[in-house]
Amino acid sequence: MKQILIIEDDTALNQGLCKALKTDSRKLISCETIKAARDQLLCGCPSLILLDINLPDGSGLDFLQELKRELPAIPIILLTANDTDLDIVRGLELGADDYITKPFSLSVLRARVNTQLRKAESLQAQTTEHVYR
């Protein structure tokens, strides 16, 4: 079962994301702070992370860099109100696999989440195949 970790401090949006992205083959884990996300990551690695930038206990961009150092294979999508070109470029250059600005379309979000999950699965399959050759 694929797990998606959502790190979003807006409780209503966090709950809405969980509802919108849940399927029979997905488990959604929601956190509202970086600390809660770190604690959750001790329990296991998700298949994908949705990460807000403006969090109450720190910068999502700083956490993004930490995550990419520790868990480079996990796709991370930034989901944020920071919508200038400079913000988007900075997020992508720091390692985000995608960048979605608020407000957003649920259908676009679902498509981007599905794309990142497919890419990660394909990469994992290629890596496994390479190891066993």
Please name every model-derived segment.
Residues Q3, T115-R133:
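Short, Lys/Arg-enriched segments at the junction into DNA-binding effector domains
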Residues D10-I29:
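Two-component/phosphorelay signaling modules centered on CheY-like receiver
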Residues S30-L48:
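Acidic, metal-coordinating helix/loop segments flanking the phosphotransfer/catalytic sites
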Residues T33, S59-D62:
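Acidic catalytic/metal-coordinating carboxylates
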Residues D52, T80:
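Active-site residues of response regulator receiver
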Residues P56, T84, K102:
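The feature encodes the CheY-like receiver
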Residues L61-P72:
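Short amphipathic alpha-helix used as the core "switch/output" element in two-component signaling
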